[in-house]
Amino acid sequence: MSVTPMNEYPATTLKNVNKMIHPHTYIHPNAKLATNVKVDPFSVIHQNVEIGEGTWVGSNVTIMEGARIGKNCRIFPGAVISAMPQDLKFEGEDTITEIGDNTTIREFVTIHRGTKDRWKTKIGKNCMIMAYSHVAHDCIIGSNVILSNNSQVAGHVILGDWAILGGMCAVHQFTKVGQHAFISGGSLVGKDIPPYIKAGRQPLSYAGVNSVGLKRRGFTIDKINHILDIYRVIYNKGLNTSQALEYLEEEFPATDERDEIVTFIRESGRGIIKRYSKNSVDEDIAD
């Protein structure tokens, strides 16, 4: 994800764009707003903020220090962007929040800037962050991601491109979610979610490959079947994780999908979710 540098935007002063900015808005003199940024009444934009061309900021929005917002974003009333992180170790470091082009941030979303761990919180392009969701410090959210209403994403989480969180999901800190994964509403996510799969039930478990989502993204039937075969080895063949990965590397052709899945699982810090069993215990949120 990249945010267009502000020096590529036409130089704009508040005097030039005052027809787009309501007089009952406060904008710090050092904030940089590109052409055609529209700001509705009672919003506050702090210093060290950059907003790209064509972005709309609704009423009663607070955009705090370190925000870097791309082009054509929509920020709905009540949102708070780039607030200080809720981290007791934070000592006022100069950190930022990056939001990619064409991202929509709905009502009362809160997004916190980074700490010295990553120095930034990053949200990709074309994302939809629905109402009352929270993205904590140092998260890396890919492009085309959807966080449904009241999703709560703790610090240092990584969400891959095209990931979807159902409403009221809670994601444990340092968790990773692979690209094209779908997580059902109300889930507690404490283990890593590999790419291309669905996760559901309690405790959160493997629920099959996200075939519908992959078809919508243009994956061929052959490629989807290849991914299904990979996950049959991981979850249905009776092998432990190490054995399954070795089997995939020895017996399956080297494809981008195979290599991505194997690498994701091998590098998982929290371990991946398991196949559902009636004897499962809720260990997903245990440290």
PLM region descriptions:
Residues M1-H24, P29-N30, T35-N36, N72, ...:
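Terminal amphipathic alpha-helical/low-complexity segments used for targeting or macromolecular assembly
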Residues K19-S205:
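Structural signal for interior beta-strand "rungs" in well-ordered beta-sheet cores
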